[in-house]
Amino acid sequence: MPVSARGAPDAEHWAWSEQTDKGRVVVLSGPSAVGKSTVVRCLRERVSNLHFSVSATTREPRPDEMDGVDYHFVSPARFQQLIDQGALLEWAEIHGGMHRSGTLAEPVRVAAAAGFPVLIEVDLAGARAVKKAMPEAIAVFLAPPSWEDLEARLVGRGTETPEAIRRRLETARIELAAQDDFDEVVVNRRLESACAELVSLLVGAVSGSA
């Protein structure tokens, strides 16, 4: 699979307007080690009624994972059924086809129709697929302050071999070259500012508004 320098409201004091007709769907993507998971955690803490899209996957759950919370765990046959029914906004084969993962369309559309802000975190290909399926979605690219910063973050993890880091950096170059294809670009210099910019995008979720 598994796009903004603008004024942002005070995320700590923001409250969702009950008059919102339709929630805005934000699709977040970016290279490895740019800080997507940390930013997502921040958004889930700041926006109390945020609907975070939970992917469907055919892989087995890990001991600490809960069905419906971390993933929707489904059988390969059920996943194929979802594909055939057009029930996925995007999907991909992971690790050479060892399993499949994808974004369920119905929960996203139901939440947005009910006026909730929706966040989907996917890779570059996934973001393009979601944007094609939902042109009204806002594709957001989370970018590092610099190439050197991204490289330092990857190396600093200390969890990957030099070869794995090299492959991730090669992929990151491709991803960074595609950032102009996104609707908004948020540079993750500081967590607080990046989170605030994304809150601004999510809470501007009034149907027909810019």
Curated annotation (Swiss-Prot):
Residues 23-203 form the Guanylate kinase-like domain. It catalyses: GMP + ATP = GDP + ADP. Keywords: ATP-binding, Cytoplasm, Kinase, Nucleotide-binding, Transferase. Gene3D superfamilies: Guanylate Kinase phosphate binding domain, P-loop containing nucleotide triphosphate hydrolases. One of its GO terms (cellular component) is cytosol. GO terms for molecular function: ATP binding; guanylate kinase activity. Its main location: cytoplasm. ATP binds at G30, P31, S32, A33, V34, G35, K36, S37. Disulfide bonds: none annotated. SMART domains: GuKc (SM00072). The keyword ATP-binding applies. It is found in: Cytoplasm. PROSITE patterns: GUANYLATE_KINASE_1, GUANYLATE_KINASE_2. Essential for recycling GMP and indirectly, cGMP. Belongs to the guanylate kinase family. This is Guanylate kinase. It comes from Mycobacterium leprae (strain TN). The lineage of its organism: Bacteria, Bacillati, Actinomycetota, Actinomycetes, Mycobacteriales. The gene is gmk.
